[in-house]
Every structure is written in structure tokens, then in C-alpha cells.
A protein has these predicted regions:
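Generic protein-terminus/edge-of-domain signal
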Residues: 1-69, 90, 107, 113-120
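Short helix-to-turn junction characteristic of helix-turn-helix DNA-binding domains
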Residues: 54, 189-192, 241
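Short acidic-glycine-tyrosine-enriched beta hairpin
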Residues: 65-79
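Ligand-binding loop in jelly-roll beta-barrel domains
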Residues: 67, 81-105
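Short, structured helix-loop boundary elements
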Residues: 21, 48, 127, 131, ...
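Basic/polar phosphate-binding segments, predominantly the helix-turn-helix DNA-binding elements
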Residues: 162, 184, 190-235
Length: 241
């Protein structure tokens, strides 16, 4: 197993320091080659925060009693006193990077970059940029050059910003796909309004739950599918008068 890590002031202890908004206390990487597995279990968690980035292979986490598989690009965040249990397997050549951090405004900082209090795992993106940023933080902790603590905060914030942009991009794509799907549904209902249309059947035929279809149709079109069909029928009847 390849490992490279560094610690603030060479301390292996959990650091809790609220004197500054955000403080990086340690950073490192693991890459499994021949070792069969690498398991971490902290029943009472740690006193600080931790963010784990899966760069290659897979990582297996237990989060809120559920087993979760993290693929490349996934980020997992642990908060103070949160139970930690995760495992990496050598035959999957897993590569992960991790960073521990503390500070007086950590919650606000995470929220600012789209990581709300109930979020434990999210997709940050499978980008080489993250490897570079993690390695820069490791190097800063190892070399301790002038103003390195400020540089650590700067690099970590850059990482959080990149992850936030990825989430915003993913949300935008999801909304765009949903809007196109609802436009197609509206076009179909508009063309076949005079036929016997069962909303539930349409949703099932297009692999959508009925509640999801109705909710997103209303959000995109401004009315429910049934109301939309009725409005078309009423408009047609008025034209025939």
C-alpha cells in the first residue's frame, strides 16, 4: 500500500481549534496494491471533520446504518463524533485522498459550498484537479513554508468551490432533462386530449412514479396533467361553439 500524509505541527491527535474560520490539520492519500484490505472503524468518530475523496476503485462506507458504495469522484464527509466505518479492497486498486479540518465557522463554510448538515456523501467529480489540490496540501504540511496555514485554507476552499460547481452543474443537467421530459409529456397530452388518457398509465409507460410525474409536470408546466387535459378539452369545446 502506498501512503503519503502530513500533519499540522506534526501532531497525530485530533485538533479542535476555533481561533480561525477554517483550519486544515492533516491530509494524506492511500493507494492499495497488494494489501488485501484496509479497514477503519471509529465507533465514536473523531473530534474534528474529515473529507474523503475516492480517486480510483471503490470504497465501502457505513453511513447512518446503511452500506454505501463510493465510486470515483465521490466525496464523503464525517462530522465530529460521527461513527466512522469504511473499508478499501486491494483487488480494486482503490485510491483515496483525505483531509481533516476544524475551525470556528466550519458549518457555515460547508453550507456556503452546498454541503448541508444532513449531507454525508456527494459527487464532487472525477477530476485530476482534486489529486493536484490534495498533493499541494500534503506538501504544504510537510514543508511548512511561510504562510502555509493560510495557503492550506486557500487550497481547501478551492477544492470545496470546485465540488460546489460540480453539484450545481449536475443539478442543472437534471433539471434540464426533467424539463424536456415534461415538455414531451405536455405535447403528447395536448395532441391526445380528446382520447381516454390515464395519467397513471402514461407515467408507468415512461418509467416514472405517478407522484414524481405529477409534481414535476406541475412545476414545469404550471398545472397538473389532469388539469392540463381538461383545459385543452374546454378550450376545444369553446372553439366549437
Amino acid at each position: 500500500m502506498y501512503t503519503n500524509s502530513a500533519y499540522l505541527h506534526n501532531s497525530l491527535l485530533d485538533i479542535v481549534d476555533k481561533s480561525r474560520p477554517l483550519i486544515v490539520t492533516s491530509c494524506g492519500t492511500y493507494k492499495l496494491y497488494t494489501q488485501k484490505e484496509f479497514t477503519t472503524y471509529r465507533p465514536k468518530g473523531r473530534k474534528d471533520y474529515q473529507l474523503i475523496y475516492v480517486a480510483a476503485g471503490k470504497a465501502y462506507f457505513e453511513i447512518d446504518g446503511q452500506d454505501v458504495i463510493a465510486c470515483p469522484g465521490s466525496m464523503v464527509i464525517y462530522r465530529p463524533r460521527q461513527m466512522q466505518r469504511y473499508v478499501y479492497y486491494g483487488d480494486e486498486h482503490t485510491e483515496v485522498f483525505w483531509v481533516h479540518f476544524t475551525g470556528g465557522e466550519v458549518k457555515q463554510t460547508l453550507r456556503r459550498y452546498g454541503i448541508n448538515d444532513d449531507v454525508n456523501m456527494f459527487y464532487g467529480g472525477d477530476h485530476a484537479e482534486y489529486r493536484i489540490l490534495f498533493r499541494q496540501m500534503i506538501q504544504e504540511l510537510q514543508l511548512c513554508r511561510d504562510d502555509y496555514e493560510e495557503m492550506l485554507e486557500y487550497i481547501f476552499r478551492q477544492m470545496l468551490i470546485s465540488a460546489h460547481r460540480q453539484q450545481e452543474q449536475d443539478d442543472s443537467k437534471t433539471f434540464s432533462v426533467m424539463a424536456e421530459e415534461m415538455d414531451r409529456a405536455a405535447a403528447y397530452l395536448g395532441e391526445h386530449y380528446n382520447e381516454e388518457i390515464v395519467v397513471e398509465s402514461y407515467a408507468n409507460e415512461h418509467n416514472m412514479s405517478v407522484s414524481w410525474f405529477i409534481r414535476n409536470f406541475r412545476q414545469s408546466i404550471g398545472t397538473t396533467p389532469t388539469q392540463y387535459i381538461m383545459s385543452k378539452r374546454i378550450a376545444n369545446a369553446q372553439m366549437l361553439l
